[in-house]
C-alpha cells in the first residue's frame, strides 16, 4: 500500500514539473531573456571615462599642461610632509638648534636651580620644572605640578604673567582644569631659546604672576648667568664664616680625638711595663 502511494506521488510531481516548464516557456518575459545578448563590459573604459548625462559628443579641448613645467621648489616637500608624521616636521625652531640633553645635563641644571632658590630665601611659593622637547620645540604645552596649582590657583581658565630675569613680562593663559600653560608660553620659550634639559625656577611673586629663572644644562652657561644674577647665587659672608667655623670645629674635634687616643695608648704601655 505504501509503495503504491509513493509511486503515485512521484508520477504526480513529474507531471507538475512538466506542466510548469511548458507554461513558463510560453511567457513573453522568458522569451525576452533568451533573446538578450550579454556583452562583457570593459573595466578599463569605466575607469577612464567620466560619467556624463548628455548624449552629445564632447568637444576635445587642448591642454598645455604637459608643455609647461613649473618648479615651485615645495611640491616634493609638501607631498612628503602629507605622508610623514615625524617629530622634525612639527618643530618651531631650526633643526640644528634642537638638542637632546643627557642625564647629567638635566640633573646639573635641576640642582643649580634648587641651589639658587635656597640662596634667594624667598617666602613666595615656588617649584622647579625640567624642560622636555614638547615644552620648548613642538607642542608648547607646559604642565605644572598639580599640588602647586591646587594650593595657589583656582580651577578656571585665567590670564597670568611670566616675568623673566631681565624684567620683561609675557602674557600667558593658565588652564585650571588641565593645570598647565598654553597660550603665551610658546613665545616665552622661543624668545629665551629654551632647550631640552633646561631647568626653570618658577616663583609665584604675585597671585597671577610668575618670576622665572632659567638654568641651562651647560655648566658654563650657568656660570655666566650666575654672574649676571649677582650676589644672589653666591653665599653671603655670614654663611662663609659659619662654614669656616664648622670646618675649624670639626678639625679641633678630630685633633682632640687623636690626642686622647695617643694618651690612652701611652698609659697602656706604662701599665704593661
From Swiss-Prot:
Entry annotated with the keyword Transcription regulation: yes
Superkingdom of this protein's organism: Eukaryota
Cellular component GO terms, alphabetical: nucleus
Cellular location(s): Nucleus
One example GO MF annotation: DNA binding
DNA-binding interval(s): 127-218
Keyword hit for Chaperone: no
Segments for region (Disordered): 225-273
Gene3D superfamilies named in the record: DNA-binding pseudobarrel domain
Stretches that traverse the bilayer: none
Ranges of Acidic residues composition bias in the record: 236-252
Main location, first listed in the record: nucleus
Keyword annotations from UniProtKB, A to Z: DNA-binding, Nucleus, Transcription, Transcription regulation
SMART domains per record: B3 (SM01019)
Basic residues: bias regions: 258-273
Official protein name in the record: Putative B3 domain-containing protein At5g58280
Organism per entry: Arabidopsis thaliana
Species lineage: Eukaryota, Viridiplantae, Streptophyta, Embryophyta, Tracheophyta
